[in-house]
Amino acid sequence: MTIFGPDISSYQAGLNLAKLADASFVIAKTTEGTYYTDGDYEGWRLQAAVLHKPFIWYHFLSGENAAAQAAHTAANVGDKSLPGMLDFEPAGSFSPTLAQAVAYVDAAHAEGLNLRLVYLPRWYWQQIGSPDLGALRDRGLQLVSSAYPGGTGSAPKLYPGDGATGWNGYGRMYPLLYQFTNKASDGGQPLDYNAFRGTTPQLVAALNPAAPASVPTPFPTPTSMEDDEMPAFATGTIEPGKDAVTVVCPPPPGTGSAGWGACWRWGRGFIRS
């Protein structure tokens, strides 16, 4: 199964999500740099919540300080638990570097944002030298690719299929989402549309961090002899026997305030000797 979702911004101002026939999820622009907040973002976020559609925010990267950009996103995203996407592509005379993208990712995570995706078209990845994208992958991000075969019509009609070249990996990452058109007709407007190979619950699971593994109970810090009245050391050997193995010999009798010193062996039961 493959599902579809639009990528929208103020260019689609006034779009009513309830009128979208093909949207199983929604991606909407929230911020750009430190200077811009999308005026339609909050309304779309609330519409998606009412419609129970997975909602993804995105930030358009600028050349400004990464921490300042992340703080700007955090102040406007509305719900930090929502999954987010970094839009990593050039604009005007600015061409972002991989280092700038990684810096924003780190700053966003430090702000508590659930940044999970990076939109990086293959052509721009090639333009910046076809780098290994392990730094993004290792930070928990998944790739969104783009390639437009052309044509007009609905998103399902334009989708080139699960085997399309837009699904091919690069930089040692493979796309979780594939933006396959910028001309899908839906809701009365031409829209960018993305595909996900899976179900809506599978997409939700992929965009949310896994539950943390259980943390082993720390090994207790040794207490003083006064605390437990047992010496903090032992002597002796481990010796094989027919029915028993000597495991631990504490110090000689009378050592410590409790007079420890007996030897315990493991055999058919605990045997004191």
Predicted regions: what they are:
Residues 1-18, 134-227:
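Functionally critical loop-and-helix segments that line ligand-binding/catalytic clefts
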Residues 1-118:
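Substrate-binding cleft of extracellular glycoside hydrolase catalytic domains
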Residues 16, 40-44, 65-68, 132, ...:
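General structural signal for secondary-structure boundaries
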Residues 35, 64, 125, 152, ...:
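Flexible, glycine-rich phosphate/dinucleotide-binding loops
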Residues 57-59, 120, 208-212:
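Short C-terminal domain-edge/linker segments immediately following a structured domain
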Residues 83-160, 164-165:
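Catalytic domains of cell-wall/extracellular-matrix polysaccharide-remodeling enzymes
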Residues 217-273:
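Short, surface-exposed polybasic-aromatic patches that bind anionic ligands, especially phosphate groups
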